[in-house]
């Protein structure tokens, strides 16, 4: 399977991998009932006809099913991965072979990563996208940073706080020189909205909304119950140990593991390690989450307590500098260190660059300290489940990506009479319950139905929604 004749608007590792990718996409479709039902329901209506979606989300087999669902609903699409290690090259090849522009290679450099992200906005024919589908907020951030600089505030471009920021700001400067005056403003004006996949990207959106700098409406897909309580929790429960095992081949049973953070991702990660036979410790700043961890039977400690005791360390906080170089100096010889939060700054990777690195295999490095003790770093502190394994299973991603599809429809087709202002919204409970319903039959669930008198008794409709908006699942 090769790309369509004359179609060259893609960058992938090897287009010859497309046949392999297509076979795996076919398998994934069977495990993604929500997306397939969405195609069947909305396909004839073409609600995304005219949508030009700039997508920045891990270019996996499951994402390929999402991309082709959006295309089946009428959208025109350009796509990049949101992480330098998360691309599955056969998935990217299959999408390119289908004639959809995609720019994603597993192991791309940071410079390549940001160059590819910029390609999202170089629409064929000289137009711009009118929708963003984001994971982590990098595509959204590029538009906002460029717009800010166009408005005359350029001082921040000379104050990078990391290697990646230096590369990112250099890209913004280059685009300001190369593109027509007001290019970023034109993009911002044309964007009808963004749907954001993950906790970290949502934080960025709320920060901008609170400051009044958000340039277009946003839907927070992450906080849909059928995303955060399934993808973040059950997805991590399956994929974390998969990444650690593929990366290291260590026996997990009997090991001491430390999980930093006990939100939904941390809960899933701790459960993953416990089910593998680890003795699990947890650190938390939130007293509620700390109490939850203790009530689940985990030992709640600080990272300082855990550093010399644990064999495996996992960060899952969405915050920075969770594991510092001081913590790593105190670790056992060949302790395993990894991250399952969105960005790599949860671990102080930059502070290790002047030490001796020995690459064991792709995304597995041994780092030696001056005292000769070593640690094993997975995926250079980036997402371990996608860098060292294949990410979450298709079924749980179907729920997340069905939410993404509904959010894109909502922002593009249903934003009548300025229904959505430049704020952050969540999908209504009715759609959350709909997404859940679409996945029940696949796993043999028989749902009990309320009688009218029962529904009246608890003050809900027979068809739902069954919980208030503030209900905590």
From Swiss-Prot:
Signal peptide: none annotated. PROSITE patterns: ADOHCYASE_1, ADOHCYASE_2. The keyword Hydrolase applies. NAD(+) binds at residues 198-200, 232, 265, 284, 319, 340-342, 385, 467, 471. Binds 1 NAD(+) per subunit. Gene3D superfamilies: Adenosylhomocysteinase-like, NAD(P)-binding Rossmann-like Domain. Disulfide bonds: none annotated. Pfam families: AdoHcyase, AdoHcyase_NAD. Its main location: cytoplasm. SMART domains: AdoHcyase, AdoHcyase_NAD. It comes from the Bacteria. It is found in: Cytoplasm. Its cofactor is NAD(+). GO terms for cellular component: cytosol. It is an enzyme of class 3 (hydrolase). Pathway: Amino-acid biosynthesis; L-homocysteine biosynthesis; L-homocysteine from S-adenosyl-L-homocysteine: step 1/1. It catalyses: S-adenosyl-L-homocysteine + H2O = L-homocysteine + adenosine. HAMAP family: AdoHcyase. Each protomer consists of two large domains, the substrate-binding domain and the cofactor-binding domain, which are separated by a deep crevice forming the substrate-access channel to the active site, and a small C-terminal oligomerization domain. Belongs to the adenosylhomocysteinase family. PANTHER family: ADENOSYLHOMOCYSTEINASE (PTHR23420:SF0). This is Adenosylhomocysteinase. It comes from Bradyrhizobium elkanii.
């Amino acid at each position: 399977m090769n790309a369509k004749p004359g179609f060259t608007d893609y960058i992938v590792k090897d287009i010859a991998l497309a046949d392999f990718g297509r076979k795996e996409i076919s398998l994934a479709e069977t495990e993604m009932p929500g997306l397939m039902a969405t195609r069947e329901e909305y396909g004839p209506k073409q609600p995304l006809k005219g949508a030009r979606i700039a997508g920045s989300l891990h270019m996996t087999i499951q994402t390929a099913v999402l991309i082709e669902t959006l295309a089946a609903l009428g959208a025109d699409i350009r796509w990049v991965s949101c992480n330098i290690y998360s691309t599955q090259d056969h998935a990217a090849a299959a999408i390119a072979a289908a004639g959809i522009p995609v720019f994603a290679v597993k192991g791309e450099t940071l410079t390549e990563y940001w160059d590819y992200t910029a390609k999202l906005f170089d629409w064929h024919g000289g137009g711009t996208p009118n929708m963003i589908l984001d994971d982590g907020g990098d595509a959204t951030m590029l538009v906002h940073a460029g717009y800010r600089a166009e408005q005359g505030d350029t001082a921040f471009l000379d104050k990078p706080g990391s290697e990646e920021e230096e590369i990112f700001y250099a890209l913004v400067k280059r685009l300001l020189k190369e593109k027509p005056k007001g290019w970023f403003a034109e993009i911002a004006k044309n964007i009808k909205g963004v749907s954001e996949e993950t906790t970290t990207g949502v934080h960025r959106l709320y920060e901008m909304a609170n400051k009044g700098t958000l340039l277009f409406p946003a839907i927070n897909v992450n906080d849909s119950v059928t995303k955060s309580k399934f993808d973040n929790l059950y997805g991590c429960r399956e994929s974390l140990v998969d990444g650690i095992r593929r990366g290291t081949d260590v026996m997990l049973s009997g090991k001491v593991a430390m999980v930093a953070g006990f939100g939904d991702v941390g809960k899933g990660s701790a459960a993953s390690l416990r089910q593998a036979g680890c003795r699990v410790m947890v650190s938390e700043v939130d007293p509620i989450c700390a109490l939850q961890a203790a009530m689940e039977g985990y030992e709640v400690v600080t990272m300082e307590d855990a550093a010399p005791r644990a064999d495996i360390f996992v960060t899952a906080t969405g915050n920075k500098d969770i594991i510092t170089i001081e913590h790593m100096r105190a670790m056992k010889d060949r302790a395993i260190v990894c991250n399952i939060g969105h960005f790599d700054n949860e671990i102080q990777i930059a502070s290790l660059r002047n030490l001796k690195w020995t690459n064991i295999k792709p995304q597995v490095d041994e780092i030696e300290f001056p005292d000769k003790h070593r640690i094993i770093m997975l995926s250079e502190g980036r997402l371990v489940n996608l860098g060292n394994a294949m990410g979450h299973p298709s079924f749980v991603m179907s729920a997340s990506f069905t939410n993404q599809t509904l959010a894109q429809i909502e922002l593009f087709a249903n934003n009548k009479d300025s229904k959505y202002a430049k704020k952050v919204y969540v999908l209504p409970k009715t759609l959350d319950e709909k997404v859940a319903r679409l996945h029940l039959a696949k796993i043999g669930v028989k749902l009990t139905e309320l009688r009218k008198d029962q529904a009246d008794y608890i003050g809900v409709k027979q068809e739902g929604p069954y919980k208030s908006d503030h209900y905590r699942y």
